[in-house]
Design a protein with these regions (language model features):
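Long, highly charged, low-complexity internal segments
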Residues: 2-30, 137-251, 283-298, 302-304, ...
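Intrinsically disordered, low-complexity regulatory segments
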Residues: 1-114, 120, 181, 409
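Interdomain boundary/hinge elements
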Residues: 78-81, 105, 260-266, 355
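Short, polar/flexible loop-turn hinges at active-site or ligand-entry regions and domain interfaces
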Residues: 27-29, 55-57, 74-80, 99-107, ...
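Accessory beta->alpha helical hairpin/"wing" motif in late/C-terminal subdomains of nucleic-acid enzymes
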Residues: 259-285, 446-454
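Short, conserved phosphate-binding/catalytic loop or strand-edge motifs used
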Residues: 85-90, 224-225, 245-254, 258-267, ...
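Alpha-helical scaffold elements adjacent to nucleotide-binding pockets in ATP/GTP-utilizing enzyme cores
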Residues: 40, 44, 63-71, 91-95, ...
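C-terminal or mid-to-C-terminal helical accessory/interaction module adjacent to the motor/catalytic core
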Residues: 33, 39-40, 66, 87-170, ...
Length: 454
């Protein structure tokens, strides 16, 4: 059907296609250009004994199946609904074993959202167009736009405040002034910083050295929103571009003599992985990196607004490495697939381990602090270091110093000013929308694109 075949009409009161006075009953009409699609499908149905509806495995897909059921005149006894989350031979064949009927609750959910979109969006858009140069408004779009406007007003109202930092420079590391008599110190101007500098000498006493071994856990597999956020931050891809490329990776790439779906369905709130994928990945990790690198699957914390009907976004086969499919992908397809692949792989690998050292130095009751981190077991970072900050900062073994006195090479100070809140990047706006429960994963890209273009 190539997507939706019907939508709300623009007839009736306010052109909503919704009978507000009759229990909000919707009136549907065929989408322009879809009459031929429907006619062709009707011919195919007449030649068939049984019909399988295999639209996308989400709310919109369920609604499309329902509309097709209606316009094609299907009967309960001559159709089934099948669902798969990856376009692979095994997944498609397995879906026939779990065939079901249309989930009317999902359909009703989609219909309610669409009606709300129309009631709010249509009427608000017309009001805005009559009063301003605005192009459109919407149930999700307008709230997201308010976030952007509120942030801009914060920036405009922001008044910078002066502050100063003081740093002691030693042969192998630097330490920053943190406290005075172990209470947080704030230096507001040049007069105050000069008073501090006058009291400091070059000799520092090692007051305390703390050493801890910490575990650094890998992140869960991608959801729609986390994929869009990291693609924006690391690959400089817009949400729209990310979803376009992900759609292609999901639908299939030509690999030699076959078309293969490389990733699972990319509109999802879930971080779950199938038992089969976990088992295969554990075997892959053991064979390639060793048993010490095997981790455990992430468990989601249940949120009220999360729909956990699917898996997280992952490669359809852990054996199909990014390097093995590189010749068949464009540069952007390769970059996105590589990020999805290694995120899923890393999520099932062992924690990284770091030795963390912090030192407190005293100079005339002023305490300076420095910290260092060394990776002692790379764990999941063996495959995921390109996407996380893994910079090491090494401190000398200060706890073994015979003398408790260190002499600095120099002590410097620097003027700073507080910064206004940053404007939203696409990644930060998506994160904020998700945390506030604004919109759905499937709407983020379109919402942001509308705001950007209109």
């Amino acid at each position: 059907s190539k997507g939706h075949v019907r939508d709300l009409s623009t007839s009736g009161k306010f052109g909503l296609g919704v009978d507000i006075e009759n229990h909000f009953k919707p009136k549907y009409t065929t989408i322009k250009g879809k009459k031929k699609v429907i006619d062709d499908l009707k011919k195919d149905v007449k030649k068939s004994d049984f019909v399988y509806l295999a639209t996308d495995p989400d709310r919109e897909g369920e609604a499309i199946s329902w509309h097709l059921y209606d316009v094609l005149g299907l009967k309960p006894e001559n159709y089934d609904r099948i669902v798969f989350h990856e376009i692979t031979k095994n997944a498609v064949l397995d879906s026939f074993k779990h065939a079901r009927k249309i989930d009317q609750d999902l359909v009703n959910s989609q219909e309610a959202r669409r009606i709300l979109d129309r009631i709010i969006g249509f009427r608000l858009s017309k009001l805005i167009q009559s009063k301003t140069d605005g192009k459109s408004a919407g149930r999700v779009q307008s709230v997201a736009l308010k976030l952007i406007v509120d942030r801009e007003r914060e920036i405009e109202a922001f008044i910078p405040e002066e502050y100063w930092s003081v740093t002691a420079h030693f042969k192998e590391f630097d330490a920053d002034l943190a406290t005075y008599n172990h209470k947080k110190i704030e230096i507001h101007n040049e007069v105050e910083v000069n008073e501090v500098m006058e009291k400091l000498g070059n000799a520092f006493t090692i007051e305390k050295v703390d050493k801890k071994t910490k575990n650094k856990k890998s992140k869960a597999p991608f959801t729609t929103s986390t994929l869009q956020q990291l693609a924006s931050n690391k690959l400089n891809m817009s949400a729209k571009k990310t979803m376009t490329i992900a759609q292609k990776l999901y639908e299939g790439i030509e690999l030699e003599d076959e078309t293969v779906g490389l990733i699972t369905y990319m509109r999802t709130d879930s971080i779950r992985l199938s038992d089969e994928f976990i088992k295969n990945t554990y075997g892959f990790i053991k064979a390639k990196y060793g048993e010490d690198y095997i981790g455990y699957a992430k468990q989601a914390k249940k949120k009220d607004n999360v729909q956990d009907a699917h898996e997280g976004i992952r490669p359809t086969s852990i054996n199909r490495t990014p390097e093995s499919v590189r010749p068949y992908l464009s540069d952007d397809e390769f970059k996105l697939y590589r990020m999805i692949y290694y995120r899923a792989l890393a999520s099932l690998m062992a924690d990284a381990k770091t030795d963390n050292t912090s030192v407190t130095l005293d100079n005339n009751n002023y305490q300076f602090k420095a910290s260092g981190q060394v990776i002692i077991f790379d764990g999941y970072l063996k495959v995921y270091s390109d996407y996380e900050d893994t910079k090491e900062s090494i401190l000398p073994p200060l706890d073994t110093y015979q003398s408790k006195i260190l002499v600095s090479n120099s002590i410097t100070n620097e003027q700073h000013f507080t910064s206004p809140p940053a404007r939203y990047t696409e990644a930060k706006l998506i994160k904020e929308m998700e945390e506030l429960g604004i919109g759905r994963p499937s709407t983020y890209a379109k919402t942001i694109d509308n705001i950007r273009t209109r």
